[in-house]
A protein has these predicted regions:
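Catalytic core of pol beta-like nucleotidyltransferases
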Residues: 1-25, 33-39, 49-96
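Conserved histidines in hydrophobic membrane contexts and catalytic metal-binding motifs
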Residues: 28
Length: 96
């Protein structure tokens, strides 16, 4: 799966995913966004959880997306980002 496939799948399912898991998908970042992924790369997805979302929601969305994208997925909460990492993440971010 490449960057365009990931963007397509996330875009197609965005509305239903956001309702089901109480979040907003912001985009992908990291090696897939840059186009320098390897077989061992995971897909980094930046999200913003809504009030009422739980740790279980975060685990569930990760499992669901790993199944749908057929790859390891790293769900990163925008609120949990460390300030020193934000410039690097936002530089690579491809909005969905």
């Amino acid at each position: 799966m490449n960057k365009n496939d990931i963007i397509y799948k996330l875009t197609q399912e965005k509305e239903s995913i956001e309702k089901r898991y109480k979040l907003k998908i912001k985009g992908i970042f990291g090696s897939y966004a840059r186009g320098d992924e390897s077989e061992k790369s995971d897909i980094d997805i930046l999200v913003e959880f809504e009030k009422g979302a739980s740790l279980l929601d975060m685990i569930d969305i990760g499992n669901y997306l790993e199944e749908r994208l057929d790859n390891k997925v790293d769900i990163v909460s925008e609120r949990a980002l460390r300030n020193e990492l934000k410039p690097y993440i936002y530089k690579d971010l491809i909005a969905i």
